[in-house]
Amino acid sequence: MPKKTLYKPGQNEAFELSRSKIDLFLQCSKCFYLDRSENHRIARPGGPMSYIPTAIDLLLKKEFDVHRQNETVHPYCEDHSLSLIPFKHDDIEAWQNNRKGIRYHHEDTNLILYGAIDDCWRDNNNVLHVVDYKSTTASYDPKTLEIKQVSLDEKGAPHKYWYKKQVEIYQWLLSKNNFDVSNTAYFVFASALYKNVEAFNKKLDFKIDIISYDGDNSWMENTIVNIKSTLESNNVPEGNKNCIHCKYRGVN
């Protein structure tokens, strides 16, 4: 098992890359190179830990684990006319572990790609669907205060582009592990309700929405090859001219 977290050009040892590092490369190849290169070791500053979303993810996993064990459909799925069952597999806990995840050794580049899924559901034909949990606050119409429908529209919400890339990476990893994987992934949105609520009273109520997304991971292969080429270079790449981190460092 590879132990190095920084890459040395020309190394023979397989090198691990998490899903988040693939995201980093897509966002800015310069930031990625500075972060992973043994010659630089310059990481982007980290943000604060999101403890409440993490807690919601944990509780959702506990709920779906009950239905995984019983091989039953969760009521959330029934509410959305989905007859999908949480996938039961000996490695599911490892796949959901951020330090382990589902892995694939890309032999042509000697890179080990991995990522921790939130969940995986199966249909009646044992075709797998990647599932990702997202927690947020409900969006309301400013005039009527009616709750707006959750969507994956990126307009005004560019982070949702990365939601999509995230599940596409997981779809690719599962397929490379010889599972039959659907292009259709699902996002389970837990939206906290706060308008028309009299007081906190030490609790929040949530609206659950399940949104489907048809992924396309055909970009993965070329991206992996480009990642390896970047790691092997002794030159810092140009990166993304719109990268705010590079602008802050004054290196663009």
Where are each of the predicted segments found?
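Metal-dependent nuclease catalytic cores in nucleic-acid-processing enzymes
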Residues: 153-185
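Residue-level signal for well-ordered alpha-helical scaffold segments within enzymatic catalytic domains
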Residues: 35-36, 63-66, 119, 129, ...
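Conserved catalytic cores of phosphodiester-cleaving nucleases, focusing on short active-site segments
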Residues: 28, 113-153, 165, 169-170
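Metal-dependent nuclease catalytic regions and adjoining charged, substrate-binding loops involved
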Residues: 1, 16-17, 173-252
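Short catalytic/ligand-binding loop motif for oxyanion handling, primarily in non-cytosolic enzymes
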Residues: 33-34, 41-43, 138-142, 193-197
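Metal-dependent nuclease catalytic cores that hydrolyze phosphodiester bonds in DNA/RNA
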Residues: 1-127
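Short histidine-centered catalytic/ligand-binding loop motif
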Residues: 49-52, 141-161, 206-213
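A structural signal for short, well-ordered beta-strand segments and their strand-loop junctions
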Residues: 33, 121, 129-133, 182-189
